[in-house]
Regions:
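Helix-loop boundary and gating motifs at the non-cytosolic
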Residues: 14-63
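Core transmembrane helices of Major Facilitator Superfamily
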Residues: 34, 115-127
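Helix-breaking motifs and short loop linkers at transmembrane-helix boundaries and internal kinks
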Residues: 81, 102-107
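Intracellular juxtamembrane helix-capping segments at the cytosolic ends
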Residues: 41, 122-135
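Short hydrophobic/alpha-helical segments at membrane-entry points of transmembrane helices
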Residues: 23, 105-113
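Helix-to-loop junctions at the C-terminal end of transmembrane segments
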Residues: 69-81
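Structural signature of the two symmetry-related core transmembrane helices
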Residues: 84-99
Length: 145
């Protein structure tokens, strides 16, 4: 990288704090949803008498949904915008989370799990993108920890 001429101040890379705080809040929400969602739903299913095999099969839907959602996130965000895609993912995650509470039919928890974890994966990918876009390269290590 070339050095600026002597006497010329080096460019200052500013961090846009409101955007960075929002992006970190988003990734924090993703961490809470994954960290609490997987074990809590398994405990609820166990309390309802669901076999451990079916609980494991239902939990596997999270991984499948995550792989599928990660594959389509960039294209979706490109077509509809990052903010709109994130808002849709938040809406889908919230509706499916409520579905776990109100829907007692175990078999309907499979599509709920796919929607919930697919939406959470979209939020994860776009939050990471947002953090990387907001933090200047020279400070990215500081921001990401």
């Amino acid at each position: 990288m070339s050095q600026p001429p002597s006497g010329t101040p080096a460019p200052v890379e500013e961090i846009h704090w409101p955007s960075l705080i929002a992006a970190i809040a988003s990734i924090t929400a993703v961490g809470i949803a994954i960290g609490l969602g997987l074990p809590l739903l398994s405990i609820i299913m166990e309390k309802r008498g669901i076999s451990s095999t079916l609980i494991g099969l239902n939990s596997a839907m999270a991984g499948l949904a995550s792989m599928a959602a990660a594959a389509i996130t960039a294209k979706t965000a490109h077509n509809y915008g990052v903010a709109n895609t994130m808002l849709l993912a938040i809406l889908l995650a919230a509706i499916s989370a409520l579905g776990f509470y109100y829907i007692e039919d175990f078999w309907l928890w499979f599509p709920l799990r796919v929607v919930f974890h697919g939406a959470i994966t979209v939020l994860f990918v776009l939050s990471e993108f947002w953090i990387n876009a907001t933090a200047p390269p020279s400070r990215r290590g500081l921001v990401l920890g």
